[in-house]
Structure formats: C-alpha cells, structure tokens
C-alpha cells in the first residue's frame, strides 16, 4: 500500500487548451477516493494519467515516495478494474485471475496461493473451473476484481466498473467493493458518473467539472455544504432546488425571479454578513428539507405533478420560472392543484453568488 499525491496536475493535448487544470490532492495510504462528475469533466483522463496510460503535461504524480510521471504502467505497482471485464473467453476463472502474474514470471505456487486467497475473499471458489460465458455479469466483474487483487498492488484504480450491470447487481457490487476495501485497506481511486456510488463508497469525493476539482471532501460535507452551484445541482438525487432571485434590504425575504413569491428566509446563517442584503443571489434548498413541518417558515407551492418513488413521493411545482421539488412521506400524495405548504428551514438554506457560482456563508 502507498499514499498517492497529485500536485498541480494538468493535461493538454495541443499545448494550448487544457482538459485538466491544476489538480492538487493528497490521498492517504489506504484511503478510498471517488472521482465523480458528468461526461467530459476529466475524471477518466485523470485516472488514466495516474495509471500511466496518458502523459502528464504539467505537475507531479507520486505513488508512495516515487514520482511516476515517466514510468510505464507496469512499473507503477497499480492494478485496474475496468467497465469492460476484459476476460479471456478460452480461459477458466482461475486462469484469468492468475494470467497477469504468469506473464510476469511469478512462480506457480505463488500464483495458485494468491488466486485461492482472492477467490475466497470474493466467494469465487465454486466458479474457478468455469469460463466467462458460464458466468453472470456480477460474477464476471468479481473475476475482474480478483485479477486485480492477486497483483497485491499499492493502488487500485477503478474505471466505472459497475456501469454494465443492472440496478440490483450494482447495489450488490457496491456492498462487495465496500467489504473488499475494509478487508484489504488498499489505496483506491474510483471513477464514476453515478453519485450514489460516490456517496456510498467514498471516504472522500472529488467532484469534477470541466477539468477542475470543484470540491474535495467527505460525502456528507459535500452534500450538506456544497462549495458551488454546480456541486449543489449535481450531488443529490433529486437535485437541490436552485432559484435565482433577490434578497430584500432587511434580509427577511427572497423574491424568486420570473414573478415568483417572496420567500421567508430570515435567520439563515450569514445573512447581513457574508450574505449581503439588497442584492441578487441563487438560493438553494434540498427537496427533503422542504417537507412540511410545524414551527418552520413556509411558502405555498402550487403542485402540478407528484411522483411516487416507493418509500416517499416527490411533489413538483413552480415558483416563478423555476421548477421546485418537495419530498413527501409515502402516505402524503397531493393532487394536481393542491397548495402545498413547503418548509423553508433557515439553517437549511444555501446562498450562492450568481456570477462566480461560489457558496456564501
């Protein structure tokens, strides 16, 4: 195992326009980091640079005490798990897991021992004699993880490994990856566009956007205190409600743009200090914090639709020209046209600068 250090890492393909802009992060020995963001944000490019599959334009990547910028992938002491399982169809599970060690000249007894140990961890022992065509998608992905485990690397790199699996298998594999990391405690970098994977697997997440690391932090911190409008809108399902508007001179109300109502916001932390009154802001509040509750400031939301999500419901309406969603208990399913008393708890309100996108307060 080893720590992983990224200092000022940049990537450009033409020498002019950068696709990664000065990524700085120190990943502790044994830490599980998730790179999350939309397509084209640079997360997979960054992972490939760590792996040695892409060159580093500027900056430094170090694994342990070694700067690896110019090292070949085979010399970096890493193991990768890909979206595509990349299993040899003519080989058995055991042969697929041990093949990488075989071509490196590792002794047969060592290979057999490592394959047996990995198979036990991943519950693949009954499948060792089977070939890939005889396995389910989840089993194939476990074989791919087993192939990485037997290498006993300093760093695991996961490139959207669950993307090809159905929803039920993804849940199962998330749990298996959690258990695997708890057992091996190997430094891991995991790339995904799926925020549920990011929130459930990561010790820290790096939210990527247009080649920048928008925010780095523990999942709960990123969720509860998003640093930018982008993070606020990207992390969370359903997404945070974000509304442009103007904060009154006395800081008591926020008038939603597009003819929306004046929302009661008095008491929100930072108003009158970091959050200047009498100016435009972007107001954010999560749907689950707007569930009607006694003793909390409220505003009426005309309901135009309601989604049944199973354990709860999601009521939709509009304030001005902004769509607004409110999470409700399973038994509370308002009809179209209902006037819903949406809660606006002061300590759950977020204010963002409309020009910079950065959080205030």
From Swiss-Prot:
- Write out the GO MF terms: ABC-type glycerol-3-phosphate transporter activity; ATP binding; ATP hydrolysis activity
Q: Which domain of life is it from?
A: Bacteria
> What CDD domains does the database record attribute to this sequence?
ABC_MalK_N
One of its GO biological process terms is: glycerophosphodiester transmembrane transport
Q: Which residues belong to any copy of the ABC transporter domain?
A: 4-235
Residues the record lists as binding ATP: 37-44
**Keyword annotations from UniProtKB, A to Z:** ATP-binding, Cell inner membrane, Cell membrane, Membrane, Nucleotide-binding, Sugar transport, Translocase, Transport
Name of a matching Pfam family: ABC_tran
Q: Which residues cross the membrane?
A: none
Instruction: Give the E.C. number(s).
Output: 7.6.2.10
> Where does it localize?
Cell inner membrane
Recorded hits in InterPro entries, A to Z, give:
AAA+_ATPase (IPR003593), ABC_transporter-like_ATP-bd (IPR003439), ABC_transporter-like_CS (IPR017871), ABC_transpr_MalK-like (IPR015855), ABC_transpr_MalK/UgpC-like (IPR047641), Mo/tungstate-bd_C_term_dom (IPR008995), NA-bd_OB-fold (IPR012340), OB_MalK-like (IPR040582)
NCBIfam families, from UniProt? PRK11650.1 (NF008653)
Q: Which PANTHER family match?
A: MALTODEXTRIN IMPORT ATP-BINDING PROTEIN MSMX (PTHR43875), SN-GLYCEROL-3-PHOSPHATE IMPORT ATP-BINDING PROTEIN UGPC (PTHR43875:SF12)
Function, as annotated, reads: Part of the ABC transporter complex UgpBAEC involved in sn-glycerol-3-phosphate (G3P) import. Responsible for energy coupling to the transport system.
Description of how the protein assembles with itself and partners: The complex is composed of two ATP-binding proteins (UgpC), two transmembrane proteins (UgpA and UgpE) and a solute-binding protein (UgpB).
> Per the similarity annotation, which family is this?
Belongs to the ABC transporter superfamily. sn-glycerol-3-phosphate importer (TC 3.A.1.1.3) family.
Name the chain's protein: sn-glycerol-3-phosphate import ATP-binding protein UgpC
């Amino acid at each position: 195992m080893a720590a992983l250090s990224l200092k000022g890492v940049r990537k450009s393909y033409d020498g002019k326009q950068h696709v990664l802009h000065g990524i700085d992060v120190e990943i502790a020995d044994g830490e599980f980091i998730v790179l999350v963001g939309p397509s084209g944000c640079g997360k997979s490019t960054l992972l490939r640079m760590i792996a040695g599959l892409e060159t580093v334009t500027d900056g430094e990547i170090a694994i342990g005490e070694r700067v690896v910028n110019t090292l070949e992938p085979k010399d970096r002491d890493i193991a990768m798990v890909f979206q595509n399982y990349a299993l040899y169809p003519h080989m058995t599970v055991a042969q697929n897991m041990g093949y990488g060690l075989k071509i490196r000249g590792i002794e047969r007894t060592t290979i057999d021992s490592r394959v047996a140990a990995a198979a036990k961890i991943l519950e693949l022992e009954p499948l060792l004699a089977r070939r890939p065509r005889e396995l389910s998608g989840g089993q194939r992905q476990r074989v791919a993880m087993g192939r990485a485990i037997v290498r006993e690397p300093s760093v695991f790199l996961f490139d959207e490994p669950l993307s090809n699996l159905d929803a039920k298998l993804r849940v199962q594999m998330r749990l298996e990856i959690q258990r695997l990391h708890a057992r091996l405690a190997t430094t891991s970098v995991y790339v995904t566009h799926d925020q549920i994977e990011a929130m459930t697997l990561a010790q820290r997440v790096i939210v990527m956007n247009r080649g920048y690391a928008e925010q780095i932090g523990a999942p709960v911190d990123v969720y509860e205190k998003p640093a930018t409008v982008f993070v606020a809108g990207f992390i969370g399902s359903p997404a945070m409600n974000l509304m442009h508007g103007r904060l009154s001179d006395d800081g008591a109300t926020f008038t939603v743009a597009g003819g929306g109502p004046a929302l009661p916001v008095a008491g929100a932390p930072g108003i009158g200090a970091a959050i200047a009154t009498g100016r435009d802001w972007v107001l954010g509040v999560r749907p689950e914090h707007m569930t009607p509750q006694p003793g909390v400031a409220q505003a009426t939301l005309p309901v135009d639709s309601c989604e049944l999500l199973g354990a709860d419901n999601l009521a939709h309406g509009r304030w001005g020209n902004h769509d607004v969603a409110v999470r409700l208990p399973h038994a509370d399913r308002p009809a179209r046209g209902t006037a819903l008393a949406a809660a606006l708890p002061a300590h759950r309100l977020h204010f963002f600068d409309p020009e910079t996108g950065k959080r205030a307060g």
